[in-house]
Design a protein with these regions (language model features):
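Glycine- and Gly-Pro-enriched alpha-helical subdomains that act as flexible
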Residues: 80-86
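Conserved, helical-rich catalytic subdomain that frames metal- and/or nucleotide-binding sites
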Residues: 185-245
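N-terminal lobe of the biotin/lipoate ligase/transferase fold
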Residues: 1-75, 89-96, 100-106, 113-115, ...
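Short, low-complexity Ser/Thr-rich regulatory SLiMs
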Residues: 88, 148-153
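Short beta-strand segments
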Residues: 12-14, 37-39, 79, 148-150, ...
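Cytosolic ligand/metal-binding cores
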Residues: 145
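Short, acidic (Asp/Glu-rich) active-site segment that either coordinates a divalent metal cofactor
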Residues: 153-186
Length: 247
């Protein structure tokens, strides 16, 4: 980035052994996931930059709908500010009990269903990162994708991690970091390289037009689509800082 590489560079890792998230949290990135970074140099107003993570989330959602059709259309939601999640109660979603997967069965682009999320009262801390229901139950979704933005060297590095294929033993993680996988949306799954490549290609194809709109006109033209597929629709959200003070 500091050397002046033009925007459009995509760097991909097959796995990461020293990944980390916000606040230095360690992050496991085994083979079977999509881990990539995009170099962008958008000439936009500074106030628009935080919405770039939502644009990327919309691209991830569009990509999965293109690959998995109606199943993704109904189940995949964008969680502000930087996640894409899978609704656990969606009719088509299959979760840890569905362990036998062999050949990638992705369909053509799905039909627009426009189904609204079931309303639930949630409380979210630290930019919506930690959420629980009023009665202490876990949120009704699992994490498919995480997105990061880092401004550096006159550009923005956009990191995208998508859980594509589950490991042999699914991680025992609860709460906001409970994982979901693209394989949960497919009737069957192909070899890891084929599946991950399909997700990468679909993501880049979906991101290009969204990025063009955002770069020219900001987030305003995309608000309606984001609102239609936000995981927090109909929910009460409370934001607190690290010291648990209400923001």
């Amino acid at each position: 980035m500091e050397a002046g590489e033009p925007e459009g560079l995509v760097v991909r890792a097959l796995r990461q052994v020293s990944g980390y998230g916000r606040q230095g949290r360690s992050w496991t990135s085994p083979e079977g996931g999509l881990y990539c970074s995009l170099l962008l140099r958008p000439q936009v107003a500074p106030r628009e930059l935080p919405t770039l993570s939502l644009v990327v989330g919309m691209a991830v959602r569009r990509a999965l709908v293109a690959l998995a059709g109606a199943r993704a259309e109904e189940a995949v939601r964008i969680k502000w500010p930087n996640d894409v999640v899978l609704a656990q109660k969606a009719r088509y979603a299959r979760f840890p009990e569905a362990t036998e997967i062999r050949d990638l069965g992705f369909s053509e682009s799905g039909k627009e269903l426009g189904q609204k999320n079931r309303a639930q009262r949630l409380f979210c801390a630290n930019e919506g990162d930690a959420c629980s229901a009023r009665d202490g139950r876990a949120p009704d979704f699992a994490k498919l994708c995480g997105i990061s933005l880092e401004a550096h060297g006159g550009g923005v590095c956009v990191g995208v991690g998508v859980n594509v294929l589950p490991p042999d033993k699914r991680p025992d993680v609860g709460g906001k970091n409970r994982p979901a996988y693209v394989a949960d949306l497919a009737d069957s799954v192909a070899a890891p390289a084929v599946a991950v490549e399909a997700v990468l290609e679909a993501l880049l194809a979906a991101f290009a037009p969204l990025y063009g709109v955002w770069r020219r006109n900001g987030f305003a033209p995309l608000v309606d689509e984001f609102n239609a597929y936000s995981s927090l629709n109909g929910q009460n959200v409370r934001m607190v800082d690290r010291a648990d003070y209400l923001l």
